[in-house]
Amino acid sequence: ATSVTARSHAGRMVGDVFPWVAATARRGYADLQLTGELEGSLDAVVSCLPHKASAECVASLLADGVPVVDTSADFRIRDLATYREWYGEHPAPEWIPSAVYGLSEFYREDLRSTRIVANPGCHAIAAELAIGPAFNANLVEREVIVDSKTGVSGASRNVRRQTGGSCSPETSI
C-alpha cells in the first residue's frame, strides 16, 4: 500500500492539494488521503521533511530496518562541524556514515545495499550530471565553480501572500 503524509494538508486528498497528479498517468494517487502520521507496515519511506526534522523522524525508521530516501541535507553533509554551522546540532549523526549519496548515475552499486539514501539537491544533480563525466575522465581540473540559479520559490522557500506572491529574494541578477 502507498500512503502519503503531510503536515499542513493532513486530511485532504492528494489530488486536491496537487491537481496535476490527477491529470497524469498516476491518477490513482489523486485519491490517496494525506495523513498526519505514517501508518501501518512500511516497505520504504521517502522523506521530504525540512532539514533537521527529517533526521529526527527517520532515525527510528532506520533503527527498525525501514529503507529511507531523504531529500533534506541531513545525510548529505558528512562533516558534523559543517552541518552544525548551517543547521545546528545533527539529530541522528550515527546514521551519517551509512548514508549513500543518491546520484544513481555515479553510485548505483552502493545504492543497492544501503538503508539510507541521501538524495542530492537539484543544483547538485544538475552540476554533477553535467560535469561528472569530465571529472571521471580526468578532463577538467578538480576544483570548479558552478554558478547556479533558482527561482525565488526554490530551496524550500514559502510564498508570502502579503508580498504579492514573492518569496524573499535578496537582489536581482
Regions of interest found by a model, annotated:
Residues 1-172:
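N-terminal Rossmann-like NAD(P) cofactor-binding subdomain of oxidoreductases
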